[in-house]
């Protein structure tokens, strides 16, 4: 790889890490430090900011060409995806409301396992035995982390776990519902974020509206807090742009490894800021999980490099877009 190309790849990875970790930390700060305990409303703010941002990028600045979708397909394909997309984001923010960033990020590493199991159980897809074997350290690491978590909260744990299922469902549905459309992260947000806003707006208003009014009256500096909340939404959209940049600046393997290292960075930064207690065995469990995710990505990449004469598993990844980091769900959701 040329020196200039290596520099661009490194820059792309660093800015992606920066936006991703900042959004996660800001969301946790909003819930914990600002005492704004309304995950539905935070998610809705992110959807609105992402809708506006995607419109500006595509329609006003014309930095990305619009991928045209038939009106019928918008409701038949995009809307169901947007519903799962919305649930996925909300569950992530709900889990952040109740459990530490370190625990939440580790649980989300369970996504490869839930994806493989769902495809096997529901869609009856065959997987090479090496895929199953590579999931063992992920599952073991998650179990060790969960039983040794000092700030364990069952509701937050379940939200994060169901978030993994939502991520897996979204990924699987995308293969069929979005077939024929080559969406990038910006076009994905352009179509899905408005639907997600529509889906979540009324529930957020009904369930959290009165609580937000009470918070606004009781908070010593509500306007400053609202600026922080709005800023998190703007940064969440910027994250989508960073994802687009890093996908086109790195190889699949580099992207996978960088995605797993990003989780380690998020865990470390969150601990430095929030100082949530982490036991030795808890840290070991987190480490095992991340190593397992990296190994899983390596196995899938090796299977994808098989020669044409070698039997392939039906879902051996065929492109970089199928090898996005396995410990986050940035492929279709960005992080709005």
UniProtKB/Swiss-Prot annotation:
Subcellular location, record wording: Membrane
One matching Pfam family: TPT
Superkingdom in the source lineage: Eukaryota
Membrane-spanning ranges: 11-31, 38-58, 83-103, 131-151, 154-174, 193-213, 227-247, 254-274, 278-298
Keywords linked to the UniProt accession: Membrane, Sugar transport, Transmembrane, Transmembrane helix, Transport
Membrane disposition: Multi-pass membrane protein
GO cellular component: Golgi apparatus; membrane
BP GO annotations: GDP-fucose transmembrane transport; UDP-galactose transmembrane transport; UDP-glucose transmembrane transport
SUPFAM superfamilies for this protein: Multidrug resistance efflux transporter EmrE
InterPro entries the record matches: Sugar_P_trans_dom, TPT_transporter
MF annotations from Gene Ontology: GDP-fucose transmembrane transporter activity; UDP-galactose transmembrane transporter activity; UDP-glucose transmembrane transporter activity
PANTHER family tied to this protein: SOLUTE CARRIER FAMILY 35
Similarity annotation: Belongs to the TPT transporter family. TPT (TC 2.A.7.9) subfamily.
Record function comment: Nucleotide sugar transporter that specifically transports UDP-galactose.
Protein name, UniProt field: UDP-galactose transporter 1
Organism of derivation: Arabidopsis thaliana (Mouse-ear cress)
């Amino acid at each position: 790889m040329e020196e200039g190309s290596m520099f661009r790849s490194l820059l792309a990875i660093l800015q992606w890490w920066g936006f991703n970790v900042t959004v996660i930390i800001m969301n946790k700060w909003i819930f914990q430090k600002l005492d704004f305990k309304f995950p539905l409303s935070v998610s809705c703010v992110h959807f609105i900011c992402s809708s506006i941002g995607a419109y500006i990028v595509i329609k006003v600045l014309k930095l990305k060409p619009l991928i045209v979708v038939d009106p019928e397909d918008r409701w038949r394909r995009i809307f169901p995806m947007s519903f799962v997309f919305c649930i996925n984001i909300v569950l992530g923010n709900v889990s952040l409301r109740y459990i530490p960033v370190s625990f939440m990020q580790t649980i989300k590493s369970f996504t490869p396992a839930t994806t493989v199991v769902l495809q096997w159980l529901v869609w009856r897809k065959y997987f090479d035995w090496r895929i199953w074997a590579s999931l063992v350290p992920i599952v073991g690491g998650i179990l060790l982390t969960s039983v040794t978590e000092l700030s364990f909260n069952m509701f937050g744990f379940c939200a994060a776990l169901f978030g993994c299922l939502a991520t897996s469902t979204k990924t699987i549905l995308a293969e069929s519902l979005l077939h024929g459309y080559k969406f990038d992260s910006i076009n994905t947000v352009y179509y899905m974020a408005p639907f997600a806003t529509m889906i979540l707006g009324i529930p957020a208003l009904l369930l959290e509206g009165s609580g937000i009014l009470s918070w606004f009256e009781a908070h010593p500096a509500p306007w400053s807090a609202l600026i922080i909340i709005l800023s998190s939404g703007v940064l969440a959209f910027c994250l989508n742009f960073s994802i687009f940049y890093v996908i086109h600046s790195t190889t699949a393997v580099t992207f996978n490894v960088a995605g797993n290292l990003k989780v380690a960075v998020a865990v470390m930064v969150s601990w430095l800021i929030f100082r949530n207690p982490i036991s030795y065995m808890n840290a070991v469990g987190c480490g095992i999980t991340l190593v397992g995710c990296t190994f899983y990505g390596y196995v899938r990449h090796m299977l994808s490099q098989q020669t044409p004469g070698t039997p392939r598993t039906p879902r051996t990844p065929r492109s970089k877009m199928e090898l996005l980091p396995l410990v986050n769900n940035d492929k279709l959701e960005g992080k709005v």
